[in-house]
């Protein structure tokens, strides 16, 4: 629930306390809640950049937390198309993200592979343990394991989002370009559990919040064919056994060139963004 100011919450007498109105003993009473001094300092620092909203009470892992949100005005950049520098991001299940810094003339200024293999191994190891427990004694004994897997999955999404935003700021990009990914519906195949755990929307939303805070715009393009088509225009790319490779991350173009699939897809994402902008202008 949300604690609205004056009606549900008030500042406490001590700077590190706050008073909340809660339903206790069949009546609404004011109680004093102590906050960590480090959290209070963080709230004060954030309040300098924007307006603080009413706190919200949340329950996580059998504990209660107060979440404060901040609202502020930010001017997004309006760089001309000829001078615009973008960060094209191809997100995937095997490699978390592949980023390419591009300009309108097609020049690739930088490339970045983002992959937290250790975090994913920890998650997949936990999921395999869940399978074994469910097979032997049912699903009633897996709550703790599921909580552990979800926690590390959320942490992985935060790490990937932070790395993408840091890359955009490092190379002074004006726009971050994502694919519009829609994986709704029933998943099939051997990777259905990985797809179910893939927090692509959380990553994109977190990156958008971090980017807007620093004046960087975020755009989405159609994902159709970005991975299947070769970036050099030679046609469809062959992957995995079709190209004679054991790895699905390496592809072969129609002209015989071997290249990284995700890197080629990031080039296509950037090119598709600039084509759309040129047509609109």
Question: Where on the chain are the PLM-derived regions?
Answer:
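Acidic carboxylate diad motif detector
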Residues: 1-60, 197
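Positively charged, helix-rich recognition surfaces that bind polyanionic ligands
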Residues: 62-281
């Amino acid at each position: 629930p949300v604690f609205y100011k004056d009606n549900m919450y008030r500042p406490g007498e001590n700077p590190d306390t706050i008073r909340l109105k809660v339903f206790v003993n069949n009546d609404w009473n004011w109680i004093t809640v102590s906050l960590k001094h480090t959290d209070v300092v963080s709230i004060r620092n954030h309040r300098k950049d924007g307006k603080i909203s009413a706190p919200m009470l949340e329950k996580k892992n059998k504990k209660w937390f107060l979440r404060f949100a901040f609202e502020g005005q930010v001017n997004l950049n309006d760089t001309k198309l000829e001078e615009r520098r973008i960060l094209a991001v191809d997100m995937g299940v095997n490699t978390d993200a592949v980023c390419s810094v591009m300009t309108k003339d097609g020049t690739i200024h930088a490339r970045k592979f983002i992959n937290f293999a250790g975090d994913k191994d920890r998650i997949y190891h936990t999921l395999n343990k869940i399978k074994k427990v469910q097979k032997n004694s049912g699903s009633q004994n897996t709550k703790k394991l599921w909580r552990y897997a979800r926690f590390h999955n959320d942490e992985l999404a935060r790490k990937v989002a932070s790395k993408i935003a840091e890359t955009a700021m490092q190379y002074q990009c004006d726009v971050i370009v994502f694919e519009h990914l829609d994986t709704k519906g029933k998943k099939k195949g051997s990777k259905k559990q990985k797809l179910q755990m893939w927090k692509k929307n959380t990553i994109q939303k977190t990156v958008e919040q971090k980017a807007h805070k620093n004046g960087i715009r975020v755009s989405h393009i159609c994902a159709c064919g970005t991975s299947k088509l070769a970036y050099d225009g030679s046609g469809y790319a062959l992957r995995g056994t079709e190209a004679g490779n054991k790895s699905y991350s390496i592809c072969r173009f129609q002209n015989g060139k071997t290249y990284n699939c995700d890197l080629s897809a990031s080039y296509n994402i950037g090119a598709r963004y600039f084509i759309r902008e040129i047509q609109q202008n």
